Amino acid sequence: VGYVPVRGDCLEGTVNFVSNEVRELPADGRDRLDALFRSDPLMSRLDAELLSWSPGLATVRAKIQAAHTNFIGGGHGGIVFSLGDIAMSFASNGYGRQALATQIDISYHRGVLPGDLVIATASEISRTRRFGHHRVEMKVNERLVASATGTTYRTDEWHFGAEFWPDDWRGKY
């Protein structure tokens, strides 16, 4: 809660601030991004659900199914990783600027089983003009099963085109 100052882009020498407060997206940006996120093919393939999102924050969930298990019968770590990656992609793209994961480090703390409902929450730690850094937690029944940190590259491209987003929004985010 509150603001965390981060060093700005080296080329611009600016300072950006990351807030945990909900940001109001311009015009119908929220509805269009929501539809875009909900159309994610991998999320659909995993029968995952987007629970909530705002710029810099997102939560998704999925029940571990028999098809999500590894050869010893436990939930496959790749499914848990994918849920975290999906949450991070929505959090980082929630400003409207296209962002791509460049790195994710994950630690598995306990296994998951078929029937477990995994909830993955990604939150922004810091953001500059070019990079976003995120923390991701995957939980079952409020117990941490995996945690990750990741970096995203923030491109110059905007979802729905730059002209869709007001100048002040593009300048700030």
What function would you assign to each model-found segment?
Residues 2-173:
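Terminal targeting signals and extreme-terminal segments of soluble enzymes
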